[in-house]
Swiss-Prot record:
Record-linked PROSITE patterns: TCTP_1, TCTP_3
Example GO molecular function: calcium ion binding
Domain TCTP: 1-179
Domain of life: Eukaryota
GO biological process, one term: sporocarp development involved in sexual reproduction
Pfam family name, one: TCTP
Alphabetized InterPro entries for the sequence: Mss4-like_sf (IPR011057), Mss4/transl-control_tumour (IPR011323), TCTP (IPR034737), Translation_control_tumour_CS (IPR018103), Translational_control_tumour_p (IPR018105)
Keyword Oxidoreductase carried by entry: no
Subcellular location: Cytoplasm, Cytoskeleton
Name used for this protein in its record: Translationally-controlled tumor protein homolog
Gene Ontology CC: one annotated term: nucleus
Length: 179
């Protein structure tokens, strides 16, 4: 299995269990799923006496449910929700992308990436940035578990069918780790 880590923060953000497609040479896209996840669950050890553990005989309190993306849940990504005021405004996100592009380029150079890889990133990134900014209002924005503001922001939108969510990540902003 291959885990993809953000080269800036080191956060795990993707794995090869997703069907990953390269877009425009610089972006990865992968289809996701949305599902209801139970919240506030009380976990008990199998065979434990619930009353001795401070629980009740019915197996604990019932939790609520929240809709999550599988990639968000699997990699403990943090959703910057617009309704909570956490999603950055478009201008702020544009500034983040500018800084992020410089950091990715430096990281590629520091790790001795081949010239072809660096040139592919330099050539493809500006068009990808424009494409992302044009569609920014449609994206859900997520960050890695560390909440490193300089790291990659994972973008989630829906395919043309309006049902299938997909994540967009920067190909050159990831490093592979075999596990």
């Amino acid at each position: 299995m291959i885990i993809y880590k953000d080269i800036i923060s080191g956060d795990e953000v993707l794995s090869d269990t997703y069907n990953i497609k390269t877009v425009d040479g610089v972006l990865y896209e992968c289809d996701c799923r949305k599902y209801l996840k139970k919240t506030n669950e009380d976990f008990e050890l199998e065979g434990a006496n619930p009353s001795a553990e401070g629980g009740d005989d019915e197996g604990g309190a019932e939790g609520g449910e929240v809709m999550v993306h599988d990639i968000e849940d699997q990699f403990r990504l943090v959703w910057l929700k617009a309704e909570d005021g956490a999603k950055p405004p478009k201008d702020a996100f544009k500034g983040h992308l500018k800084t992020y592009m410089k950091k990715v380029l430096k990281a590629l150079q520091d790790k001795g990436a081949p010239d072809e890889t660096i040139n592919e990133f330099k050539k493809g990134a500006p068009a990808a940035v424009n494409k992302i900014l044009k569609n920014y209002d449609n994206y859900d924005v997520l960050m890695g578990e560390s909440m490193d503001g300089d790291a990659m922001h994972i973008l989630i939108d829906f395919r043309e069918d309006g049902v299938t969510p997909y994540a967009t990540l920067w190909k050159h902003g990831l490093e592979e780790m075999k596990v």
